[in-house]
């Protein structure tokens, strides 16, 4: 049975093999260390059963609290190993992050994704995320940059009656 737990610094070396998947954005070790330091409790790893606890997937999240806008959660990175896709791991990781963002008082959760990744788009929209805007040439790939969709899912809040 898959186990889910909070990401630790020593996991960064274990998840390295997942980073080289064609559908995964490649970030530096510094990126991941910074996220674990700045946003404790917002990153989670899914582990395979067995003594080695092989990583099956992970999510890195952020919580943004700026004076100029409402607080929100941001999915910085979500990856599930190709051999474990279609098992509901991405949904479980996203649901976890949405719940934590809600508990922290977020108004919504957002993410950015490549417009060519239709499987991810279908997953996110099936979970209630909606297209907010498109950013041209967001991913500066060689030789051809690719645009990104920003998707959002709002946290339901009760209406206040006065």
Model-derived regions, located:
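Short coil/turn segments at alpha/beta junctions that flank glycine-rich nucleotide-binding fingerprints
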Residues: 87, 104-107
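Conserved catalytic-core motifs of GNAT/GCN5-like acyltransferases
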Residues: 110-112, 125, 130-150
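Short Asp/Glu-rich motifs
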Residues: 38, 120, 143
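Short amphipathic alpha-helical segments embedded in low-complexity Lys/Glu-rich regions
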Residues: 31-37, 109-116, 137-140
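Acetyl-CoA-dependent GNAT
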Residues: 2, 9-83, 94-104, 154-160
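Conserved acetyl-CoA-binding loop-helix of GNAT-fold acetyltransferases
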Residues: 80-82, 86-99, 118, 122-126
